[in-house]
Amino acid sequence: MRRILGLLLLASLAFTAYAGDKTTDIFKEDGTVRVECKASYKRNGMSTADLANILTGISTIKGTQYYSQSKKEVTTLFTDAYTVEEPDYAKKTADKHLEAPLPQKIDIFGMLEDSRFGENVYQFSYVFDENHIILKITNIAPMRYSFLKAIDTNCFTCLLDIALTEDEIVVNNKGFCKPAVLPSFMESRINNAITNRMDALFGWFEKGITE
């Protein structure tokens, strides 16, 4: 019964976050875990600047949930999230707020703390056009699982590609991660952790445009 309730809650969360046409594919090729997610949503009058400020609101990643296969329940994935001033000096600062006209490019650093890999600083790189936004999220230091290095620097990447048409927001997201060499008994666990985090980052943005 507990598992059924967890699945029902997950379905409810997914409907809230992905209230549009959506397909997700997860596969592994040449040791690289890949996630691809395509979706479309009603634009509802949102501007490029509106979407940009959803993406720069790094603190809103805090509390993002997922369904844990090991715990058989919906649980919090990112327990903390905030913008930092410098990658090597993780001092918390306010989220970046942008006004039109948007800059062509900006880089922001964010600290994300999660239940599996602990605290890690990521680089959020943005490219803005009139009706198009690309966000690349990359780890800038090794990510560890307990005492083991699970992911090398610059080996975890989420790419959010967002285009605005007259009536829709079209999302084409891709995630890539090549884990470090790990004991065979840990590979499946780490691969699942990677795909969960990619899907959660995609869902964070998509939830922001549907709430």
Please provide the spans of the model-predicted regions.
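Hydrophobic ligand-binding cavity/cleft-lining segments
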Residues: 19-116
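A short acidic/glycine-rich loop-to-helix N-cap element
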Residues: 146-151, 177-197
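Surface-exposed amphipathic alpha-helical segments
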Residues: 190-211
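A short, solvent-exposed beta-edge/loop patch
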Residues: 158-189
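Hydrophobic h-region of N-terminal signal peptides that target proteins for export
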Residues: 10-19
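Hydrophobic/aromatic beta-strand elements that line small-molecule binding cavities or substrate pockets
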Residues: 121-128, 157-164
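Sec-dependent signal peptide recognition
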Residues: 2-7
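A mature extracytoplasmic/lumenal domain signature
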Residues: 128, 137-141, 173-177
